[in-house]
């Protein structure tokens, strides 16, 4: 297989017929138009303000909406706010809200819900702030029922992107068990270990995004062989799989593939010995053969990375970093010796156990590191434990994981700011922090150059070993149309339909 950088649709029509329960309907309710698809892991939290998992986000984007939304290109479009104004000094944002929106629990959407949302997220409501993104927010006020003004302490060019955050209804306290949003799909149920069910929102305000299906059944199924079996037997209508797995399908399917703006990385804890020595981190850069990982783990369906940026972010992407580190074991050994580690050392790679490709990648890396006398032990841990141990507490030496795509470069590169709570790489460079701050108030042209310099700084410091952007692979029944890729995690159920 060859690498692909653009969406490919390959019809796989084979001779074997598959028979099972009826396609597109549930066994119990044959009068509904149903799509059955999988998600790789359990939802980490049904409350969108508390969730951190990309799989959860991909599904629940259908349930929740922000003041602004995004299209297939990543461009911002009106959401719950039909328009907005930004003051000349960049400090005041005025949002003009839709007046025809109803939450799934029947509550009419209005300015009070926006005020509640942003006071909760920023801590302005008196409680502990739920998101560091809104620490710059000094006030949020309802001008009238459908106009809200937000004021910032300092101008921030990324702020509008942040308003994609889910707006939740004031006074509703059951989000973690029975989530309520305004989106085109309504949460019906979650059966732990089995499935999430979403129903069409019959009262959805936007006719252009009105779902064409009645119900989506999202099965929690991360094992590729199980997904393939379910597709083959007709128990799934669509499946999220890995590239090499799709070749094993027989029957009438379409394989959709596209880069997903994800960064798979071998993250090194920069504050822990021996990774507090930049020479060791640089040695690892030279010792890891990314082509071997891309070909062996992802069957060639991935794009090699050189910093924490995918080429999908073309406007901001620094294409001058591709030759900074090339696979060179001798150079890696030289750097290890300079750092005093000629005889190597032992490390642990802590990997979330529900992501097989990250485990596979860790296994390849472990073999490669033997060439520089590094003995790597792979420690698979459950997703919840990984989130607490690594993502929250940075209590690890190394990890292999995928960082989800973001629409604004500040969201991507802000992960490495020294005081960012989820900087689990523990990267600390005051000059880098300064560049990120400068970018907040810079012009569009200046931001491009600042973010390119940030990428160079991360690469020079070898803050992590960035591996690849794995292609997203979605297999659908040949009559199921409308599957659309986005530069962030999103399974857009509203676009799916069956061709008659």
Question: Whereabouts are the PLM-identified features?
Answer:
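Structural transition elements
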Residues: 303-338, 356-358
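Extracellular/periplasmic solute-recognition and catalytic clefts
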Residues: 139-141, 188-197, 217-272
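Aromatic- and charge-enriched surface segment that lines or borders ligand/interaction sites
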Residues: 82-127, 274
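N-terminal lobe/hinge region of extracytoplasmic solute-binding protein
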Residues: 38-88, 119, 180
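Alpha-helical secondary-structure segments
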Residues: 110-117, 145-149, 183-184, 212-215, ...
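Gly/Pro-rich hinge or "lid" segments in bacterial periplasmic/extracellular proteins
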Residues: 72-75, 158-217, 223-226, 330
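Detector for C-terminal structural segments
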Residues: 287-315, 357-366, 387-500
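Surface-exposed binding/hinge segments that line
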Residues: 85, 89, 129-171, 189-191
């Amino acid at each position: 297989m060859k690498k692909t950088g653009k969406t490919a649709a390959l019809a796989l029509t084979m001779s074997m017929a598959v028979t099972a329960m009826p396609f597109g309907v549930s066994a119990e309710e044959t009068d509904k138009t149903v799509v059955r698809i999988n998600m790789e892991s359990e939802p980490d939290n049904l409350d969108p303000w508390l969730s951190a998992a990309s799989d959860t986000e991909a599904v629940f984007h259908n349930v929740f909406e922000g003041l602004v939304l995004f299209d297939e290109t990543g461009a911002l479009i009106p959401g719950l706010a039909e328009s907005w104004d930004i003051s000349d000094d960049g400090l005041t944002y005025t949002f003009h809200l839709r007046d025809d929106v109803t939450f799934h629990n029947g509550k009419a959407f209005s300015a009070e819900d926006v005020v509640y949302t942003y006071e909760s997220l920023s801590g302005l409501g008196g409680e502990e702030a739920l998101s560091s993104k809104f620490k710059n927010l000094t006030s949020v006020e309802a001008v009238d029922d459908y106009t809200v003004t937000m004021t910032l302490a300092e101008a921030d060019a990324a702020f509008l992107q942040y308003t994609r955050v889910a707006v939740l209804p004031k006074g509703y306290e059951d989000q973690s068990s029975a989530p309520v949003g305004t989106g085109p799909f309504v949460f019906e149920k979650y059966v732990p270990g089995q499935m999430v069910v979403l129903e069409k929102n019959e009262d959805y305000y936007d006719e252009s995004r009105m779902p064409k299906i009645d119900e989506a059944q999202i099965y929690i199924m991360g094992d590729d062989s199980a997904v393939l079996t379910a597709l083959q037997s007709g128990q799934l209508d669509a499946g999220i799989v890995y590239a090499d797995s799709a070749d094993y399908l027989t029957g009438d399917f379409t394989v959709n593939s596209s880069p997903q703006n994800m960064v798979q990385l071998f993250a090194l804890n920069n504050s822990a010995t021996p990774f507090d020595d930049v020479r060791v981190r640089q040695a690892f850069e030279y010792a890891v053969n990314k082509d071997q990982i891309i070909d062996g783990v992802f069957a060639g369906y991935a794009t090699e990375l050189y910093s924490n940026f995918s080429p999908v972010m073309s406007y901001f992407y620094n294409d001058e970093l591709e030759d900074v580190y090339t696979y060179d074991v001798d150079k890696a050994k030289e750097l290890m010796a300079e750092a005093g580690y000629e005889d190597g050392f032992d490390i642990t790679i802590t990997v979330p156990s529900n992501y097989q490709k990250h485990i596979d990648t860790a296994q390849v890396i472990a073999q490669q590191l033997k060439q520089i006398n590094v003995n790597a032990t792979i420690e698979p841990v459950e997703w919840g434990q990984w989130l607490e141990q690594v993502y929250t507490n940075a209590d690890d030496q190394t990890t292999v994981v995928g960082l989800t795509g973001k629409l604004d470069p500040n969201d991507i590169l802000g992960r490495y700011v020294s005081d960012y709570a989820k900087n689990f790489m523990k990267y600390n460079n005051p000059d880098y922090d300064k560049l990120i701050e400068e970018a907040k108030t810079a012009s569009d042209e200046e931001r491009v150059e600042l973010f390119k310099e940030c990428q160079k700084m991360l690469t020079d410091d070898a803050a992590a070993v960035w591996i690849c952007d794995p292609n997203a692979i979605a297999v659908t029944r040949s009559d199921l149309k409308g599957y659309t890729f986005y530069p962030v995690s999103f399974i857009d159920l509203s676009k799916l339909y069956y061709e008659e």
